[in-house]
């Protein structure tokens, strides 16, 4: 297995710049692993594939307004801050753009455009991979000073920032959306609940590494990024109950899948128990899934860890066939793109 095995060519015009409207009008490519059939559907028709008692696991992490514009106090130069994760009281790991000549001790002034609330950030230290450690003088209004960051391949402004949030987003912490969940509407979730589907939630805060290609020739040499997650006792109980009664667990997105598999991998007493901590499980082809029976996901970047996880679930030859079909039939790719359901 080589990283180059997970490469494919995608014309730029296939990268969706705007979300489908309404959310559940996006296309859905259904992959049946048993029959190796590929079926074109609309996402709102996904209810056809559920049965009463099935469990739907979704990631309720909310994207932070993590992109903040500031002015360097010493030079008056403009600078952009991208918050990555909190590191203690008032402290955050962040990427700065531009980052050159921004040494420890640099003060950055941050103001609302209308002259309202403000704060200062002090660069405390350099960390790995161009990451800086910042301390903010006042953290209370920090979330009001920024805007939601969009992926680097989306070049069109989004009229409504909430379209880059799931309708069930609850807990601030991600810098990228759990995009497989963007297709669900409140009405669709209501229909699933009325069918007897058990809708449950986990929280996994997604970092920027989700967009980064694996550079090592052998993916096993890649150091997977860590993301903080929480899986409640109630969600673990729902999953165990489904497994014990012959029902299926549908995981929405690579983030939810990764967390439930991590929790199951670490569980000492049963299939899965409640969990809170870092998720660093790297799922590659050959991995035996313990929790996920069915998988809802978007179309992923070449050489990315989400693509490798999806390949582990579907099998790369079958998944490649699905990607070739999606490209030939003009499916929309990446964060605002269409989805697939793998059965």
Swiss-Prot record:
Q: What is its main location?
A: cytoplasm
User: Gene Ontology cellular component?
Assistant: cytoplasm
Q: What class of enzyme is it?
A: transferase
Signal peptide segment: none
Tell me where it resides. Answer: Cytoplasm
Gene3D superfamilies according to UniProt: QueA-like
Q: Pathway it acts in?
A: tRNA modification; tRNA-queuosine biosynthesis
**Which UniProt keywords are listed?**
Cytoplasm, Queuosine biosynthesis, S-adenosyl-L-methionine, Transferase
Top-level lineage group: Bacteria
MF terms in GO: S-adenosylmethionine:tRNA ribosyltransferase-isomerase activity
- EC assignment: the record states 2.4.99.17
State if Cytoplasm is listed as a keyword. yes
* UniProt-listed InterPro entries: QueA, QueA_dom1, QueA_dom2, QueA_sf
| Reactions accelerated catalytically | 7-aminomethyl-7-carbaguanosine(34) in tRNA + S-adenosyl-L-methionine = epoxyqueuosine(34) in tRNA + adenine + L-methionine + 2 H(+)
Q: What's an example GO BP annotation here?
A: queuosine biosynthetic process
> Which family, according to UniProt?
Belongs to the QueA family.
Q: Which PANTHER family match?
A: S-ADENOSYLMETHIONINE:TRNA RIBOSYLTRANSFERASE-ISOMERASE (PTHR30307:SF0)
Task performed by this protein: Transfers and isomerizes the ribose moiety from AdoMet to the 7-aminomethyl group of 7-deazaguanine (preQ1-tRNA) to give epoxyqueuosine (oQ-tRNA).
Subunit details: Monomer.
Spell out the protein name for this chain.
S-adenosylmethionine:tRNA ribosyltransferase-isomerase
**Organism expressing this protein natively:** Dehalococcoides mccartyi (strain ATCC BAA-2100 / JCM 16839 / KCTC 5957 / BAV1)
Q: What is the lineage of its organism?
A: Bacteria, Bacillati, Chloroflexota, Dehalococcoidia, Dehalococcoidales
Q: Which gene encodes it?
A: queA
